[in-house]
Amino acid sequence: MIVLPNKVRIFINDRMKKDIYLGISNFGFENDIDEILGIAHLLEHLLISFDSTIFLANASTSRSYMSFWCKSINSATESDAIRTLVSWFFSNGKLKDNFSLSSIRFHIKELENEYYFRNEVFHCMDILTFLSGGDLYNGGRIDMIDNLNIVRDMLVNRMQRISGSNIVIFVKRLGPGTLDFFNQTFGSLPACPEIIPSSIPVSTNGKIVMTPSPFYTVMVKINPTLDNILGILYLYETYHLIDYETIGNQLYLTVSFIDETEYESFLRGEAILQISQCQRINMNYSDDYMMNIYLNFPWLSHDLYDYITRINDDSKSILISLTNEIYTSIINRDIIVIYPNFSKAMCNTRDTQQHPIVVLDATNDGLIKKPYRSIPLMKRLTSNEIFIRYGDASLMDMITLSLSKQDISLKRNAEGIRVKHSFSADDIQAIMESDSFLKYSRSKPAAMYQYIFLSFFASGNSIDDILTNRDSTLEFSKKTKSKILFGRNARYDVTTKSSFVCGIVRGKLLDKTSLVEMMWDLKKKGLIYSMEFTNLLSKNTFYLFTFTIYTDEVYDYLNTNKLFSAKCLVISTKGDVENFSSLKKDVVIRV
């Protein structure tokens, strides 16, 4: 670790796929409480800008931090990627403090699309922020557009809070020129912020929250000490369904269960977690997980790898102490209990956006202060990989699991999805057969539409057959290469439970690079949040899908795009009753 005079921390990570990865601690949407919710997220969208033909890049805003990364591709170099990311924050050597009202307006529209996307695919319920005075969703809404001047002032104010002590930088390589460049830019920031934000309200413990969830989960408040962080790292590397959450200076260990009986036994104090020592902790974490640790605990004074001897040699005492602290918090009700609930009618409170939720007090009734049994945890495997065809009945459940777990990755091709994970076969089966997970998987049907229409366009099966078997979608034809013939109509309107645009497009010069560039152009116009595309077996032919509340505008953009020599687009309007009648005509597509 290299520390600049103003406390900027720089780490060299040659295993990282990104060229540069930058994080800002104490800079997430928890700072929006008592201001306009969404300022942090809006700032993230305003800052990031790049040429998608020579860079891959992204940014994210969480409860307590913001992070940005950039990677060079094609003709660009690592140095180009570093300078591009730095340019998001600095202009002519000075920290950016000016944002145009037109740009703010476009990005607020994009935020509303992101809200729609996340609520269609996920259940966006941030319990900790809600209990601390925020909302269940804190990413920004369209009503911010009514206060553009106030929003702009808040954005400038937020930029002035950036300080060297908040900055963490990962780079693949660090030569003298790059180090000098960092000194001239991020190294010029004050060591402490010029504007000190007000303290975040203390979140409420001893609560039961009933909300959509794939698991029975409890957040256990523990002290944010070095040993407890090392204990969390130990548990995270060894077991599934264990993680942590932070808000302000508070730390919660999150433990999830698939069995309600074990869950309630743990909450009553009847049982403790069965934590066993593994052979060795390697700290082989992803760069995302490492960055999150440094940002959530900015007081860490060493490289995490400096603690690898301690975490292995002292693991027994670290885990015993952590286990005792967990049990004490259970008994003292320093916990937030999350019960899966999918009833739209059950509600006793709402946030300011009128999202319904049930919040109750966690009482001491039935507590047993002497545990007499232990609960085994799901152990991680080194690596596992499966391929699921689009005709497999487990397709949607696997997609739901990957969306709810950050350490599961999936990649689509024309025949199915390839899933990388670290579960045992028995554990993954137990999760997918659990009552709460099945209800969660079925509670958000929007994600299924992407695969219903992918199956329709790529298989030649009728929409009636596909809808009849929508829980498994129909298997694609794999014996022969499909030849897709486009009909006369370019647009077909349907009614579903979601608002989206999808379809197939073909073009002689069409490739993934041009589609990514198209997606970013649509994002800049505020028309979409993201766009998925799958390369079909037919040459230069892709399937596109994007959730959007601006369906006509997106259709007009795609319909007039000169890259497409042929297209067949479906525009879905959200309604209570599905109507696919326009797709039953044989003129749509032939295989």
UniProtKB/Swiss-Prot annotation:
Belongs to the peptidase M44 family. Disulfide bonds: none annotated. Its EC number is 3.4.24.-. Binds 1 zinc ion. Undergoes proteolytic processing during the course of infection. May be cleaved into 46 kDa and 22 kDa products (Potential). This is Metalloendopeptidase OPG085. GO terms for biological process: proteolysis; viral life cycle. It is found in: Virion. The gene is OPG085. Keywords: Hydrolase, Late protein, Metal-binding, Metalloprotease, Protease, Virion, Zinc. SUPFAM superfamilies: LuxS/MPP-like metallohydrolase. Probably involved in maturation of some viral proteins by processing them preferentially at Ala-Gly-|-Ser/Thr/Lys motifs. Does not seem to be responsible for the cleavage of major core proteins. GO terms for cellular component: virion component. It is an enzyme of class 3 (hydrolase). Zn(2+) binds at residues 41, 45, 112. InterPro entries: Metalloenz_LuxS/M16, Peptidase_M44. Signal peptide: none annotated. The active site is at 44. Pfam families: Peptidase_M44. The lineage of its organism: Viruses, Varidnaviria, Bamfordvirae, Nucleocytoviricota, Pokkesviricetes. Its cofactor is Zn(2+). GO terms for molecular function: metalloendopeptidase activity; zinc ion binding. It comes from the Viruses.
